[in-house]
From Swiss-Prot:
NCBIfam families, sorted: membrane protein insertion efficiency factor YidD
Lineage summary: Bacteria, Pseudomonadati, Campylobacterota, Epsilonproteobacteria, Campylobacterales
Function: Could be involved in insertion of integral membrane proteins into the membrane.
This protein's name: Putative membrane protein insertion efficiency factor
UniProt keyword list: Cell inner membrane, Cell membrane, Membrane
Membrane-related topology note: Peripheral membrane protein
Places the protein is found: Cell inner membrane
Superkingdom per UniProt: Bacteria
Length: 113
């Protein structure tokens, strides 16, 4: 998606040129990146837009993780978990309200043992 490429370009080349001034964690650009990865374009755009409007001296700041909606389906009782999954876990879904979750990114890399 083009939005993800633009955000990564901003994070890699433009963001290091200015001082860190975001009042929230994760930063506004990281928040936008997570939103565009997990939501459709319009919802991600408006969530990011309102987040940037809140990122000013008149707001307290602090932790503001993205909230996403997701339906989880029950697992078959005969399901046998595979602990050596081929796909690495990237995000945690922390329950917020009914079918709404905080999205938290895992930043540690898995080491082979």
């Amino acid at each position: 998606m083009i939005c993800l490429k633009i955000l990564r370009f901003y994070q890699k080349f433009l963001s290091p040129l200015k001082p860190a001034a975001c009042r929230y964690y994760p930063s506004c650009s990281e928040y936008a990146l997570w939103q565009f990865q997990k939501k459709n374009f319009f919802l991600a755009f408006f969530s990011t837009f309102f987040r940037i409007l809140r990122c000013n001296p008149f707001f307290k700041g602090g932790f503001d993780y993205p909230r996403v909606s997701k339906n989880f389906y029950p697992i078959n009782l005969c399901f046998k978990p595979i602990f050596l999954a081929k796909k690495q876990l990237c995000f945690l879904y922390i329950p917020y309200k009914n079918k709404s979750f905080y999205l938290i990114k895992i930043i540690f890399k898995r080491t082979n043992q």
